[in-house]
A protein has these predicted regions:
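Extracellular low-complexity, Gly/Ser/Thr-rich intrinsically disordered linkers
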Residues: 453-503
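Substrate-binding surface in catalytic domains of secreted glycosidases
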Residues: 239-252, 311-433
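Feature responds to low-complexity, polar/acidic, surface-exposed segments characteristic
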Residues: 2, 19-41, 49, 54-103, ...
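Glycan-binding loop/region signatures in secreted carbohydrate-active enzymes
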Residues: 403-473
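Glycan-recognition patch characteristic of GH18 chitinases/ENGases
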Residues: 209-289
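Conserved, mostly hydrophobic/aromatic
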Residues: 230, 304, 363, 406, ...
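Bacterial N-terminal signal peptides
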Residues: 11-21
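Active-site groove signature of glycoside hydrolases
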Residues: 287-316, 362-374, 486
């Protein structure tokens, strides 16, 4: 009965898009109680045009009137495009009559996890509170588990004591605002126009265009249709004897890759890696060497990646990025790969994200992985979804979303027992999936796929991103306004990964 949240969002987009495209336009003048120019006028019009809302009468919307729990549940089912159900056995003691206009919506929302069975009563005629609305929206998006983890994070609202994770997520994703800088007013009832505004905010986020693709070109050749920018690997920055040096990829490989990238309509970036030692060099010399290497190779910009950046070198990296930005022509791009902020601190503490973003065109976020061994199964999800949420939330107020890019691991992580057996590209993973004595799974906890092969001892496990897992991460990016996804080498990018991004 319960559908996965990514399918819900797809249904939402298809339903609302169709409605918005075919419904006759309704002017706010149709409702005498909606003042022209009101802060909620546009959202009210869109909700009515799409069929999500109806006026209380032909001429009155019900501006300022509270939204009941039953009415909001009906609207929620319409928004997500859920197929209504009408079970013979009711879930709640106060929603027992199948003939009631909200009976099917309440049962459907319960089946999809938007509301729970924790109490016997649903209270359909009670005004919905701001807290209840936030909880229902976040649960409808499929983030119940994530909200449980998010309750550990700080909130600016002193008056929130329950459901902190749900309210934090709704607030951080820009679905619902506080009533002041320090208050959320969780018990305050929500009005019909407030519900309309929140739903249209959410609609705009889930209906955003597919993210732009950034690629990493490690192969000799490849097709790059549909990519926005592609980084050519092989560049290295070093500094010795008071001299900065940038080595470029082998010439024939470089020329072939740039040609194929341009043929696909993408920008070709020179990826230059380095370490903490390189950053000890003179900033102006390092920046000049990077600028010269980019121009000599005929690239459209630079993609900088520094390994194991020490916290005490953060200022040096920031200074270098600013110096490079000053040298680059206006039509050249500057991407910087960084470790993302992590729940436990980690390597992300070494970066001044706001300063880097002010000089670079894009920060490519690498999410730190983790492994959990329970004695039977190694859990090693790719780009753990709670870490993706934490990173985007942590950068929400310091880095513009349009300057962020989430990097996804395109290879599979192979484990035998508690020991790593390396990685597998798309072809190798497909061979494993087609092998004997294998079973595939999808972890709702990690929102990541894995396969177990039981014909070997110890059991072999491979964690990987399938279409559903990719959609879960792309969905989070969309909710935060992040417009780019970075993928690894073309040979490791499966059709399932591309489908999760583009469909």
């Amino acid at each position: 009965m319960r559908k996965r949240h990514v399918c819900r969002l797809l249904a939402c987009v298809l339903l609302v898009t169709a409605l918005l495209g075919t419904a006759p336009a309704a002017a706010s003048a149709a409702f005498a109680d909606v003042p022209a120019g009101s802060w909620a006028e546009a959202s009210i019009n869109r909700c009515v045009q799409s069929g999500l809302f109806q006026g209380e009468t032909a001429t009155r919307f019900g501006m300022g009137r509270p939204m009941t729990r039953a009415a909001f549940t009906v609207v929620l089912c319409r928004f997500f495009g859920w197929e209504l159900i009408k079970p013979e056995q009711p879930t709640y003691t106060d929603v027992r009559d199948p003939a009631r206009w909200y009976y099917s919506a309440v049962e459907t929302a319960c089946a999809h996890g938007a509301i729970t069975r924790q109490t016997e009563n649903f209270r359909p005629n009670d005004p919905i509170t701001r807290e209840e609305m936030a909880v229902m929206l976040v649960r409808a998006l499929g983030y119940t588990t994530l909200a449980g983890q998010a309750q550990e994070l700080e909130l600016p609202f002193a008056d929130v004591t329950t459901n902190k994770g749900y309210i934090a997520m709704a607030y951080e994703m820009g679905i619902i605002n506080g009533t002041s800088a320090a208050t959320f007013s969780p018990e305050r009832t929500a009005t019909r126009e407030q519900a309309a505004v929140m739903l249209m905010r959410l609609y705009d986020k889930v209906h955003c265009p597919a993210p732009k693709l950034v690629g990493i070109a490690a192969e000799q050749t490849g097709e790059w249709n549909g990519y926005d920018a592609v980084a050519v690997t092989g560049g290295r920055l070093s500094y010795a004897v008071n001299q900065a040096l940038v080595t470029r990829p082998e010439q024939r490989r470089e020329e072939n890759l740039i040609s194929s990238i341009h043929a696909g309509g993408a920008k070709a970036l020179l990826q230059v890696s380095g370490n903490t030692t390189a950053l000890k060099g003179k900033t102006s010399a390092l920046a000049s060497a990077l600028d010269a290497a980019m121009k000599e190779g005929g690239y459209d910009g630079l993609y900088l990646s520094f390994d194991n950046l020490a916290e005490n070198r953060a200022a040096a990296l920031t200074a270098l990025v600013k110096a490079v930005n000053e040298l680059l022509p206006a039509d050249k791009l500057l991407y910087v790969e960084v470790k993302a902020p992590a729940w436990n601190g980690g390597a992300g503490k070494a970066y001044a994200y706001g300063d880097l973003a002010s000089a670079a065109d894009c920060l490519v976020l690498q999410i730190e992985p983790y492994q959990l061994w329970d004695g039977k199964l190694m859990a090693a999800p790719m780009e753990p979804v709670e870490e993706v949420y934490y990173a985007l939330s942590a950068l929400n107020n310091s880095v513009p979303a349009e300057k962020l890019c989430l990097q996804l691991t395109t290879t599979a992580s192979i484990w035998q027992g508690s020991k790593s057996s390396g990685s597998a590209d798309a072809a190798e993973l497909q061979a494993l999936l087609e092998a004997e004595k294998v079973r595939t799974y999808y972890s709702e906890r990690y929102q990541c796929a894995y396969v177990q092969q039981t014909g070997v001892n110890p059991v072999r496990v491979a964690w990987y991103l399938n279409e559903e897992a990719v959609r879960a991460r792309v969905q989070l990016c969309g909710l935060f306004g992040v417009e780019r996804i970075c993928l690894g080498g073309r040979s490791a990018v499966s059709e399932a990964i591309l489908a999760g991004i583009t469909k």
